[in-house]
Amino acid sequence: MKAPRIMLAAGRSGSGKTMITCGLLRALQQMGKQPAAFKCGPDYIDPMFHEQVIGAPSCNLDPFFTEEETTQYLFCKHAAGHDISVLEGVMGYYDGLGGISTKGSAYDLAGMTKTPVLLVVDAKGMSVSALAFIKGYLQYKEDSRIAGVIFNRMSEMLYREIAPMAEKELGISCVGFVPELKECHLESRHLGLVMPDEVENLQEQVNLLAETLQKTLDFEKILAIAEGAEELSGKMPEVLRKVTESEAAAKVRAAKPILAVAKDEAFCFFYRDNLELLASLGAKIEYFSPLSDAEPPKNTDGFLFCGGYPELHAEELSENQTMRTKIRDNIRQGMPVLAECGGYMYLSESMEDMDGNVYPMVQAVPGNVYRTKKLGRFGYITLTPNTKDTFRNGGNPVRGHEFHYFDSTDCGSAWHAAKPLRKRN
């Protein structure tokens, strides 16, 4: 499959990747292109910004969770029908598992998807030193796939001097610069960036940045780099085909189960591919709001509670007693439920909010959720069930990602959690 594409990566978080990605997506749209957007890694919030810009869902690609064949399949599935795909990297380009490996990094994903990379260099306070920075990234891995450089927070006058030096001394294509735009800035909170709906004048900021990029970036070079990306097969991997064509899947499709998925301001962190897989297996997905609805959808066969910011809405969630009671009763009667992160917090006995107030929750699982003083657990983990009956998966390990400022007085004992590549559990 021919799929023009580029990845925007950087030397570290906070280099301007997200804002430049959004501006680039909008600029491509203004040029008449139909771009597709992707995010490297498990981040939920950056794809929401992409979606606000292009008006279509952005997708996560994570080389820790999926092998190369599956990763390519998911990319091709969502890139089909688009003129160009823009992948946003994560953290520093080479930063991967445990902070000691490139596995799971943006570099790893670029290799899996054979994607040419534009390195975003935050050049604030630098001139010639930026070349040493770039040289290090080019030479650290022979197959770096870095095909071009964007200098962020650099003046036009300095760029005109530095770009020719970089191209001559390093043999790298300089595709433009981004001047410092104080009007374009994304705030953050404890789980990362604020939500797109919370950013004042987001569309105006993105439009301003897009207009600027059309003047400061060489789109002819960028599009040529994207067009030069290698073709991918995009075929469905055998592991996925076996699941979707299995007898169990046929039974699920025949049963047409209703899956109630919590979705509102408190529960807003979803992976598009997970929901699409459930739908392809025959599940009828019905969204509901634990904040504002009186009760879950009727005739529900199962619950899905994803993450979000329930701690910002703890009082409202607690006050909706009818909803809490209905959910608790259904779960106690044996209804299947999958709850992660904020969704699990909601099902606990009580939850502490950001101001230290404690509110009763659904009380379907033991434990009281409390706020910690700092980020307690962060990064990828591998979960191994203590018995083969756990989760009915035959005792196979499950991969996950955690980013927690909250903890519970009862974390359970059904699984053993371990950090990959590190002696921590």
Residues of each region from the PLM?
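C-terminal and late-domain segments of enzyme folds
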Residues: 110, 215-216, 252-255, 267-279, ...
